[in-house]
Amino acid sequence: MARESGTVLDNVRRIQPGDMSSFFCTGGTTGLPKIAMRSHGNEVANAWSAGRFFGDSIGPGKTTFCGLPLFHVNAAMVTGLLPFSRGAHVVLGTPQGYRGDGVVKRFWEIVEHHHINFFSGVPTLYASLLDIPADGHVIDSLEYGLCGAAPMPVGVFRAFQEKTGIRILEGYGLTEGTCVSSVNPPTGERRLGSIGLRIPFQAMKAVIVDDAGRYLRDCAANEEGLLVISGPNVFTGYLRADQNNALWLDLGDGKRWFNTGDLGRCDVDGYFWLTGRKKELIIRGGHNIDPAAIEEPLHRHPAVQLAAAIGRPDAHAGELPVAYVQLKPGMGATEHDLTAFMQQEIAERAALPKHVRIVEAIPLTGVGKIFKPELKRRETRDALRAALAQGGAPGASIDVTTDQSGGMSVSVELSEPGLEPAARVVLGRFPFAFSISIAAQPTRSS
């Protein structure tokens, strides 16, 4: 204590903007997580820019609820460094966040007790809160909630605002962009379904690229393209050097533009709209199907709590759309009911799911995002098993794995060597790397 000046800490360490501050795993919804390296400069810049955007909505006298787990950038930044840097209070909702025992069930009680003004969550949280009555709790301190990490179904968006009266600010960001890149303004016009306006000093645009991923031109207003970002918040790169290929686009302006892998458009007023993820597109016989074209209508069904659309491998069409559905507690619907509903709601015939699968629980990541790779692996195993049986190689044991790039590889174990020629013919019709082995034969005793 004696060596300190009395007004500031005399820290021997001098932190530079380029020094590494954190190593965060990416969300991992399209494959295995990668470790993103972010500098002190990245995080300070993002907190400052977001703070300027939110203004007095987050500041002295305000209380933020941190409900996402602390290993997630939203918790560390939006409900962490951002409110701390603005002089706001932060209430931690257990180290496990919303997954902590009783946190969601007692959410409205927590809001009332701590006079929460702001919270942040993923779409699955808002869907869960719709099933928790707020009756009897005084929650008028709550000004708005932020939604990011995954697109918010419009049906959930409307239902939550109508039921609670709480404004939702939908935003967009990535671990690679520190956290926040765009968000609907807290005091300006909020556009339903939009991911909002870019925050200060965040360069962001939609661009057209060729088949090799090279930049061709900027998109016109409302033209869909690949979203790219540049600015002081954009990370250094991934820890593993081999994962840094094709991260950056050269737009000819000397800036480092990060390829987000997301598809979107920017309207004439500067509001961005997320239209899908390039890697999640379902390609059925040449038709590019955005999973949202299936998921949005399903979320409008009164019995549906969560829905996820993926592509099922098909030797003829490439992929066939399949919908997974998790029903609301106490609600009932059959696959036939949901199929009939979608026939009325989905105009694009190619987008109608070939199958609807009602499951007890859709797999989620640690922060509550729908984890589609698990569903994709499940469909791939089922499709290949059926194709092998039809092609003369029944009873195969199939293991599907996902590599760092999100690609799949298949290991097939056959019951006898004579099935291998037929199996190779069948597997050769699918765009997967595969290996074939023969199950060990039991030793016969004489």
Feature names for model-found ranges:
Residues 12, 104-108, 136, 295:
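Short hydrophobic/charged patches on amphipathic alpha-helices used for structural packing
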Residues 5-18, 23-68:
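Conserved adenylate-forming
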Residues 62-65, 91, 117-121, 134-155:
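Conserved helix-loop-beta element of the AMP-binding
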Residues 93, 144-148, 152-171, 175-272, ...:
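Conserved AMP-binding/adenylate-forming
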Residues 112, 119, 231, 236-237, ...:
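AMP-binding/adenylate-forming catalytic core of the ANL superfamily
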Residues 44-63, 73-117, 132:
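Conserved AMP-binding/adenylation subdomain of ANL enzymes
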Residues 19, 141, 165, 201, ...:
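Glycine-centered tight turns that cap/initiate beta-strands
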